Amino acid sequence: MGRKKKKQLKPWCWYCNRDFDDEKILTQHQKAKHFKCHICHKKLYTGPGLAIHCMQVHKETIDAVPNAIPGRTDIELEIYGMEGIPEKDMDEGRRLLEQKTQESQKKKQQDDSDEYDDDDSAASTSFQPQPVQPQQGYIPPMAQPGLPPVPGAPGMPPGIPPLMPGVPPLMPGMPPVMPGMPPGLHHQRKYTQSFCGENIMMPMGGMMPPGPGIPPLMPGMPPGMPPPVPRPGIPPMTQAQAVSAPGILNRPPAPTATVPAPQPPVTKPLFPSAGQMGTPVTSSSTASSNSESLSASSKAPFPSTAQAQVAVQGPVGTDFKPLNSTPATSTEPPKPTFPAYTQSTASTTSTTNSTAAKPAASITSKPATLTTTSATSKLIHPDEDISLEERRAQLPKYQRNLPRPGQAPIGNPPVGPIGGMMPPQPGIPQQQGMRPPMPPHGQYGGHHQGMPGYLPGAMPPYGQGPPMVPPYQGGPPRPPMGMRPPVMSQGGRY
């Protein structure tokens, strides 16, 4: 069994009790501080060597080691680094070192314990407030957003609206609104709509009188509600606006005629812009146009699929050259182009009734088509067909026929009196004679006429629909540009 090695002491200077990391550094320290000649600054290796140097070179005697602590100035001791240190001093140094190490360990332990305590306290404090904060944060939202839905829809759980403001209220909230209409529909709708994000709906409801305003919404809603289209975003807004108008206007019987026109756009949220453009024209249109718009509106809300098909045809219409001419006439025609197709079907059937009526109707349809397009643009998309018919009528063949009757003034009056439909009536027979070559065009004209309902009567119905002429005035720029000839040139372009 080998002896336990004594713990090695860190190098330290016996003269000044200073510790060093390396013994080499210790020797350099001793040579510079303790064994240096104070006269010539020569560095010696031991105390006795310094004494001999001074005695021989400088003829001086040195009794003590310079820069040494009291009690360790003995110059006779030959110490070099850690060698030559007395044993008792070595033991004392070990003891001191052990004490220092113990003290340092205790301090470290205390520091560590203090740090742990601080960490624990900080962690505990941090953990405690965290749970409290979330609770407080959740409680206020429960109270604030929960309050509105609670009175409106007692069945709704208070927590769901705040947590899921967008979708949850819609899904569960809408059913309660339907049955809850009588008790507190207004509040329910306002809050649910506010959560859904339909801000417009809420103000509209607020504007409407307490009870009567909303009931109209409900009858209008069932057809639109089954498809989720109204909820998504803009469509609901347009519907809300339209509903508010009819709600107020439906009460007086007279305004109902104008009201139906806005309703179809509401049912067609897909094309709100077209609906808005159409609304002013409907006001200008006469009762006949209103009745037609009513029929169209009744068709439009239910046959949403038919409208979609019409829209599909619209692109085909875009390929059709009529679009080019329609822009020349006015920006409005492109919008109504889609509705024209739906009406065109009815018009085609009516046109088949009589070929003779078709030519006359087609001739008059030029102005009428524009009027119908402007009026119907709100509800349907017949502009494309109308433009085609007009363009075809404007073709050189058709115009040539007009002068042939010999009643050129009569042909011109329709152009000039676009505002007045009566003058064209006397010239209708002549135009009818010209129309025979235009039977196919008559079909297109029938489509246009189908919108206003002029198909059965051909020219006479067109005369009945003078109000339609004002909408056609939107097209007048063509006649003024060159009477019939310039329009014919446009048709030639087509």
Swiss-Prot record:
Biased composition (Acidic residues): 112-121
Chain intervals with Polar residues compositional bias: 127-136, 323-332
Gene encoding the protein: ZNF207
Biased amino acid composition, Basic and acidic residues: 100-111
Description of its domains: The GLEBS region mediates interaction with BUB3.
Localization (cell): Nucleus; Chromosome, Centromere, Kinetochore; Cytoplasm, Cytoskeleton, Spindle
Region (Disordered), start-end ranges: 100-161, 250-377, 455-494
One GO term of the biological process aspect: attachment of spindle microtubules to kinetochore
Zinc-finger ranges (C2H2-type): 11-34, 35-58
Protein name: BUB3-interacting and GLEBS motif-containing protein ZNF207
